């Protein structure tokens, strides 16, 4: 007798091949059989007639490092079919750190991860894992190279000394030994934006030739996106490692429809030459990150206190105005999205609550200031603890990336403690299947499922994940594709997706007829 028998469904097994009629049996947390099991019995039988049965969805790019400890965590994830997530992305992992620069690191991460509680601060990844509560979904972690650098050298612009590199390498090796699934870079963020390409290669020396994935938020994602792809291909070739480009996009209207075909061609050529490369994309034209991200690299030196002093200096602010106007060497989001395309989604000071959900342009009009002055004054008042939602990408580019065989779907979900998060926290998986598969026909259902399952599992080498096959982990979704509904909007983001008939995590029922069961059967996934 099996533990669970899912009868009569249409199985989209994660590989992208056409769906087929089959029963799926589960025993001991694993898939025990797939096929015609009409004579079999089980302790729990599900009728999946008229439904699609898929592997549990996988999001290898979230920022829930600290949110795992919040009451109610898991609802946003499970209701869209997620059974496995990976945190620590963009170089911004909540561990390991804990030295003299710990407070500065927590301040820097807060607009993205939310407040990191003191009990979660630890100088080892093993210590971080030990602090986690029972988990509703499976969770993996990347070693954030930005946090590793900040832990040994702070947020200074100076080139690292030999001793810094030795300390950085020890931390990286320890994190990998503790189970990090790979290494993440955030070259658009401090302090990694201070690296030259050669320095970056030196910093990553411990993973050379080790088949350890490197995921990358590239140095530029606007007009310089192709140069950034070229830089990362050079790094990956020299280190002989797998490369995965995070949230590939071309920011700015002038770049839409032009840069992404070039970038995809570069990645495909590298793949054809034998490199292990891939990329991912989120299914929205708006992103979300620190408002601080609008600043050029030289303005980020020294951490939040130094940034605030710099922004308060009239001469420095004038320099900033020229840098934003002239651009060059960084993603000039103020120009790429426009002040009317940058919205304030997380604020902390009571006096600023009136601006929540407003654009910088709207805030400026309310304050009778220029947009730059309003933005700088807000960053000063909030000590840079502001999250933005910025509209800067094109749906045609998203579709092109989705069509690439190299891509998978991610959310890049950020978890600010206050305010209005991006709706992608709640609906990325559902949006892919509802909008890009069902409404626009960019992908077949089977290909859409592959982008959510086997492809991300391959990217980070997640054994037993992403496929319906005998012996695989029993992370499963049952749903009617026509019934899926994203629900969340930019105005009302905190609405869980609808349409999941059942979601199983490790062979235990986590969602039943759209409702959470309260089961927490997730586990920590280690390399």
Question: Which functions belong to the PLM regions below?
Answer:
Residues 38-40, 48-119, 222:
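Metal-associated gating/positioning segment near the N- to mid-region
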Residues 128-162, 168-189, 237, 241-242, ...:
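Active-site neighborhoods of metal-dependent hydrolases
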Residues 90-99, 111-238:
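Hydrophobic, small-residue-rich alpha-helical packing segments that form membrane-like cores
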Residues 95-102, 150-156, 197, 226-230, ...:
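Short acidic, glycine/serine/threonine-rich loops at helix termini
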Residues 9, 313, 400-406, 411-412, ...:
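C-terminal cap of metal-dependent C-N hydrolases
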């Amino acid at each position: 007798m099996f533990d669970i028998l899912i009868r009569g469904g249409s199985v989209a097994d994660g590989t992208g091949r056409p769906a087929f009629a089959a029963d799926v049996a589960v025993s001991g947390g694993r898939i025990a059989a797939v096929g015609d099991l009409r004579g079999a019995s089980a302790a729990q039988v599900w009728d999946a007639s008229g439904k699609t049965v898929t592997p549990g969805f996988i999001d290898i790019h979230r920022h829930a490092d600290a949110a795992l400890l919040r009451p109610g965590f898991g609802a946003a994830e499970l209701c869209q079919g997620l059974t496995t997530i990976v945190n620590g992305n963009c170089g911004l992992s909540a561990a390991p750190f804990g030295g003299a620069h710990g407070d500065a690191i927590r301040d820097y991460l807060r607009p993205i991860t939310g407040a990191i509680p003191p009990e979660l601060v630890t100088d080892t990844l093993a210590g971080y894992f030990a602090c986690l509560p029972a988990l509703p979904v499976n969770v993996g972690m990347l070693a954030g190279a930005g946090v590793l650098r900040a832990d040994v050298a702070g947020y200074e612009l100076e080139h690292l000394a030999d001793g810094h590199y030795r300390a950085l390498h020890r931390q990286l090796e320890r994190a990998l030994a503790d189970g990090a699934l790979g290494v993440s870079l955030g070259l658009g963020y401090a302090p990694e934006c201070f690296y030259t390409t050669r320095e970056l290669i030196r910093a990553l020396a411990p993973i050379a030739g080790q088949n350890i994935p490197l995921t990358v938020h590239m140095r530029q994602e606007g007009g310089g996106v192709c140069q950034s792809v070229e830089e990362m291909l050079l790094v990956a070739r020299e280190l002989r490692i797998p490369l995965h480009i995070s949230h590939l996009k071309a920011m700015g209207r002038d770049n839409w429809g032009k840069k992404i075909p070039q970038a995809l061609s570069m990645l495909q050529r590298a793949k054809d030459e034998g490199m292990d490369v891939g990329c991912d994309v989120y299914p929205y034209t708006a992103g979300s990150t620190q408002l601080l991200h609008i600043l050029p690299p030289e303005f980020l030196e020294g951490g939040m206190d130094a940034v605030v002093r710099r922004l308060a200096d009239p001469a420095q602010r004038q320099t900033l105005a020229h840098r934003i106007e002239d651009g060059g060497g960084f993603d000039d989001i103020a120009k790429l999205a426009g002040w009317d395309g940058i919205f304030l989604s997380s604020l902390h000071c009571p006096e600023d609550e009136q601006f929540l959900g407003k654009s910088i342009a709207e805030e400026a009009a309310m304050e009778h200031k220029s947009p730059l002055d309003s933005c700088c004054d807000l960053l000063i008042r909030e000590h840079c603890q502001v999250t933005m939602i910025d509209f800067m990408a094109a749906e045609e580019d998203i579709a092109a990336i989705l069509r690439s065989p190299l891509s998978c779907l991610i959310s890049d979900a950020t978890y600010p403690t206050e305010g209005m998060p991006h709706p992608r926290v709640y609906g990325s998986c559902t949006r892919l299947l509802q909008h890009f598969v069902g409404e626009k026909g960019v992908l077949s259902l089977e290909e859409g499922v592959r982008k959510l399952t086997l492809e991300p599992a391959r990217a980070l080498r997640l054994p037993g994940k992403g496929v319906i096959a005998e012996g695989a982990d029993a992370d499963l979704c049952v749903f009617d594709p026509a019934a899926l509904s994203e629900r969340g909007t930019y105005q009302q983001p905190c609405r869980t997706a609808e349409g999941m008939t059942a979601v199983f995590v490790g062979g235990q029922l986590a969602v039943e007829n759209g409702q959470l069961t309260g089961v927490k059967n997730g586990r920590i996934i280690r390399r």
